[in-house]
Amino acid sequence: MLKIDTAAACQTVITTFECSPGTCADLMEKLQSAYRDFISHQPGFVAAGLHVNDAQTRIANYSQWARREDFQAMLRSEEMRERNREIAGLSTRFEPVMYEVTGVF
């Protein structure tokens, strides 16, 4: 379960995906499959959430990892590299960015 906390000793990653309404459902299915079958089982994975906008042109992913290195190792794995090629084919752009939580209200 996601817990947003400034005192948490974890790495936060927010990834935004741009897509079309025609590919949004397929992209969401690929992302859910990746989290269910692979990402959530990787060392250091804490939690994640997927969000889609009303127009179905953007998907936002919020994930937490024990350490930055855990997230990077998952990205570099052969399975995730293959999955990311499929994800890239369904999105016009996606960008993972690492963040630090500085306030919770």
Which residues make up each language-model segment?
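Short beta-strand-to-loop capping motifs
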Residues: T16-P21, S63-W65
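Short, surface-exposed ligand-recognition loops at beta-strand->loop->(often short) alpha-helix junctions
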Residues: E18-L31
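Residue-level signal for secondary-structure boundary sites
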Residues: T23-A25, E69-F71, V104
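An amphipathic, aromatic/His-enriched active-site/gating alpha helix that lines ligand/cofactor pockets
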Residues: S33-V46, Q64-M98
